[in-house]
Structure formats: structure tokens, C-alpha cells
């Protein structure tokens, strides 16, 4: 493994640590301060949750004096180094057209998103170089490889590629709910964005809102 590739993998682990810390700050207090959030909510209108995907998670958050909840359906993706970009490609396609891309098209779209994200890294070098570990140019070159794991810098750059927020969730210990660890790009690009699930072991999957009722 090259030194540049090792830095990419190390950064993915670093991003996991940042995400875990953010999750404790972002989601914990809202749920703890509103015990009634555990009640069954009324869901907004969404496509019905299908039984063919692996799992359905609920996200509960405090809104004013009450609670709001959304069900998210998991769309598994291959763990081939492209999982971040595959997840964003899958979630974007489902949100736009209600259907997932074919495997070959999804792979091509994931690679396209990867290269556009790296283009954004280079374009925004002055903004992001400080949190890229090691040599910036070597990092960008390594990140273009299909097997390189994407992490927090790439998620942020994908918000500029899509001109849309990307919200990252992690499963809660109860294995039935998820907690948001960050809505990247939400300040710059308001509105509903793309949701992805981070498992804490370097793997991402696509999430889409659905209706369990």
C-alpha cells in the first residue's frame, strides 16, 4: 500500500472519530429531554417502506415542545472502496426517480461523483487543506483511486457537487433508531438533502425516507 493510500485510510478512521463525537453532541440531548419522543409518531407522506431492503430505522428529534420522526429505509451498497460515493449515488437516484440505478450505472455514477468531489477539493484548497492529513496533492491523487475510502472531506465536497445537503446518520445502540451526526452543507444549501448511514467501521449505505404506516 502506498503512503498516500495509507493516509486516505487513516483519515477515514479519523473522520469516524469526529462523527462519533458529533453524534453524542447532536442527537443525545434532544431525545433525552423529550421522553415522549419514544411514542409512535405521525409520519409525513413518503413512499411505503418495502420489505426487500435490509432494515428500516426511525430517527426521532425534538421539534419545539414536541417530537418529529422519520423512518429511513436502508439500501445496502457494495463495500468495494466506493461505498460513500455509491451511497450518495443510490440515495440521489431514489430521491429523484424513485428507483435505484442499475449496478453498472451506479458504479459509473459513484466514480463520477468521486472525481467531482476531488475536483472540488482542489478548487477549494485554501478552505480545506488544513484538515487534510499529510501532503494535499498526494491525498487528492490517492482519493481518485476507486478503492480509496471517502470520508468527511469528500462528504463536504459532495454537498457542493450536488448543491444539496448530505446528512449522515449512525445506528443507535438499540438497533432500531438512527441519530444524525451532521447535516453537511445545510447552511449553504437549505432544503431536504441526501441521507446516508455510517456504520462506524468505514462503511456507508444509502438511506431514503419512507412511510411505515
Language model feature labels by segment:
Residues 152-213:
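Alpha-helical coiled-coil scaffolding segments
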Residues 15, 26, 62, 79, ...:
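Intrinsically disordered, low-complexity segments enriched in small/polar residues
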Residues 48, 90, 136, 141-144, ...:
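Short linear sequence elements within intrinsically disordered, low-complexity coil regions
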Residues 1-77, 93-98, 205-213:
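Non-catalytic, low-structured ubiquitin/UBL-interacting segments
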Residues 2, 14, 146-150, 199:
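Short, well-structured alpha-helical patches and their helix-loop capping segments
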Residues 56-179:
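Papain-like cysteine protease catalytic cores
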Amino acid at each position: 500500500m502506498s503512503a498516500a493510500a495509507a493516509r486516505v485510510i487513516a483519515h477515514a478512521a479519523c473522520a469516524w472519530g469526529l462523527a462519533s463525537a458529533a453524534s453524542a453532541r447532536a442527537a443525545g440531548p434532544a431525545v433525552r429531554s423529550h421522553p415522549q419522543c419514544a411514542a409512535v409518531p405521525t409520519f409525513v407522506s413518503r413512499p411505503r417502506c418495502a420489505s426487500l431492503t435490509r432494515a428500516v430505522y426511525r430517527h426521532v428529534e425534538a421539534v419545539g415542545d414536541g417530537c418529529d420522526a422519520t423512518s429511513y429505509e436502508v439500501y445496502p451498497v457494495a463495500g468495494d472502496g466506493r461505498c460513500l460515493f455509491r451511497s450518495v449515488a443510490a440515495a440521489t437516484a431514489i430521491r429523484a426517480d424513485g428507483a435505484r440505478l442499475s449496478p453498472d450505472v451506479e458504479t459509473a455514477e459513484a466514480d463520477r461523483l468521486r472525481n467531482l468531489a476531488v475536483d472540488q477539493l482542489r478548487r477549494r484548497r485554501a478552505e480545506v487543506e488544513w484538515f487534510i492529513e499529510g501532503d494535499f496533492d498526494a491525498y487528492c491523487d490517492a482519493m481518485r483511486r476507486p478503492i480509496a475510502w471517502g470520508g468527511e472531506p469528500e462528504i463536504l465536497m459532495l454537498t457542493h457537487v450536488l448543491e444539496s445537503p448530505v446528512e449522515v446518520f449512525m445506528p443507535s445502540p438499540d438497533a432500531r433508531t438512527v441519530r444524525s451526526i451532521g447535516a453537511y452543507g445545510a447552511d449553504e444549501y437549505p432544503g431536504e438533502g441526501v441521507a446516508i448511514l455510517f456504520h462506524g467501521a468505514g462503511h456507508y449505505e444509502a438511506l431514503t425516507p419512507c412511510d411505515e404506516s
